[in-house]
Amino acid sequence: MAIAESFQLSDGYSVYAGVRARRDGVVEDAAFALAKIGGTDGTSAASKILEALLRRDVSLVMLDGCIVSFYNWVDGEALYAKFKKPVACYVFEEPEGRVEEAVRKLFTDWEVRIEAIKKLGPPTVYYTKSGYKIYIRAWGIDPVDAGRAAEYCTGFGKIPEPLRVAKIIAGAARQFLKTLGKFRFLW
C-alpha cells in the first residue's frame, strides 16, 4: 500500500492519494484525502486513506515522504500504532537541510512542528542494487527490510511502482479538482 501527495502552494490544499497494490505492484484500489498546505493534518489525511483501503493482507504502508506540503507532516509512528501495520517513509532525493530554521521563520506554532519533525527521527540511507540512494524512516519494520521491499516492487528507476502510481493519481486528482472550479470550496 502506498500514499503520496500533490500540491501547488497557490491551491492552499494538498491532494493525498493512496493505492492498495499487490507485491508485484498491480494496483487493486485507490482512495483520496485532502490536507492543508502548511497545516498539521497530514497524518489525519493519511489515516483516512488507510481507513478506506487497509485490509488484513496488507504487509507494508509506503509513504512518499514524511515532511510534506510546505512543512505539514505524516507521523509514521502514529499510523503504525493505530493500524498495526509496518510503515516506511521514503525520500528519493537527499533531504534538504535547514528545516528547523525555515519552520521557525514561517510558523507561529513552530515549536509543535519542530517537535513533530524531530520525532520522525533521522532517515537511514539505503543503497539499491542498481546504485540509487533512498532515505528511509520506518516503524514496525527494519529500514533495510523496508528498502528491500521498495526495491522488490520497483520496475525501473528508484521509485516503487505503488508510490509512483499514487503520486500520478494524486496529481491527476488535483488537476481535476481545479478544473471543476470547486477546489477552494472543499474546505
Curated annotation (Swiss-Prot):
Full protein name: UPF0215 protein PAE0952
PANTHER family in the record: UPF0215 PROTEIN MJ1150 (PTHR39518:SF2)
A Pfam cross-reference name: DUF99
Alphabetical list of InterPro entries matching this protein: Endo_dU
Family: Belongs to the UPF0215 family.
Gene3D superfamilies, alphabetized: archaeoglobus fulgidus dsm 4304 superfamily (3.30.2170.10)
